[in-house]
Structures are given as C-alpha cells and as structure tokens.
Amino acid sequence: MSAPRLIARHYHGHPHDESPRDCVVLDYDARFLRRKVLTCESGERLLVDLSHTTSLDHDGVLLLEGGGEIRVVAAPEPLLEVTADHLPRMAWHIGNRHTPCQIEASRLLIQRDHVIRAMLEQLGAQLREVEEPFTPEGGAYGHGRTHAHEHGHTNHHGQHHDHADHGHSHDHSHDQ
C-alpha cells in the first residue's frame, strides 16, 4: 500500500475553514492518538503525526500540511444511558471511578462496562443500551484525557497559541 498523500501534524478543537476538505469518523478510543494512518470518509488515507498524544474532540480539525482541514466526527458506539431521580449522585459515583461520562440535563452516557453497570443498578439507576456518538467531559482541568495522571497542557481551548507553525493565520480570537 502506498504512503498517505494527506499529512496532518497539528490539531485544533474548532474549525477555521467553513468547508473542510474531508472528515474522519472515529469512536472515543480511536480519537486518542499521536501517530496513526486514518481513512477519511472519502476513502483517502491520512497520516496523523502529532507532537504528543492528543484527545481529538467531535468537530475539531486536523490541519493538513499545505493547507486545509480534516474534520473529526464522533462515531456512534455502544453506550449505556443512565437516568435516575438523583442524577448528580450517579454522576458522582461514575466520576469517582474515573469513568469517562457525557453529562446531559436528563441523562448520563458512559461506555458499556458490566462492573459500572452493576454498581449503577445497585444504586437504583435506570439503564438503557444505546448506540450514539460519545463526547464525554474533558476533566477537571478541561484538557481531555491523558495517559495515567499527567496534568500537563494537552490542547489549546480558550488559550492563546501561535499559528506560525501550521500554515495559517488568524484575525479572530479563540475565546469560546
């Protein structure tokens, strides 16, 4: 197989281009990477070669060498929907086990896990298996997931960053 023609060495949590060149559809686990060849929705192969392991968010973009963006899309995956009369209590127990959790007003979404499922059932939660995109909270410091308990800076949400090293400039703020 030939080498990928598309190469991305930088990532941003939000798009800069109104119409990205292509997109990659990845589940939660596949969106945590440093170097990997991915297949775009069009079938084109993309080499992602980031400087450090990064958690790619839904609607983030990989910046192509030579210009252009590849949009990241969260793929549907098997999840467990959690509802309860005391949803904050369920969220606390899930968080206490360092389990990634998507928090919504009337429900929580977590990856399917029989141990966590048994705990939640014992606590009185109502559980339903669903298949949806998974976009859990980024953690206490807002930097997404890391290996082990690293507390270093992993992305640039809401912080100033230089664009000189990835082929485009801005006249707008990155504040959200």
UniProtKB/Swiss-Prot annotation:
GO cellular component labels: cytoplasm
Record-annotated disulphide pairs: none
Gene Ontology molecular function terms on file: nickel cation binding; unfolded protein binding
Entry's localization field: Cytoplasm
Compositional bias per record (Basic and acidic residues), positions renumbered to this chain: 161-176
Keywords: Chaperone, Cytoplasm, Nickel, Nickel insertion
Single Gene Ontology BP annotation: urea metabolic process
InterPro entries hit by this protein: UreE (IPR012406), UreE_C_dom (IPR007864), UreE_N (IPR004029), UreE_N_sf (IPR036118)
Region of interest: Disordered: 134-176
Keyword Cytoplasm: yes
Annotated Gene3D superfamilies: Urease metallochaperone UreE, N-terminal domain, UreE, C-terminal domain
Domain of life: Bacteria
Pfam families: UreE_C, UreE_N
Family: Belongs to the UreE family.
Function text: Involved in urease metallocenter assembly. Binds nickel. Probably functions as a nickel donor during metallocenter assembly.
Stated name of the protein: Urease accessory protein UreE
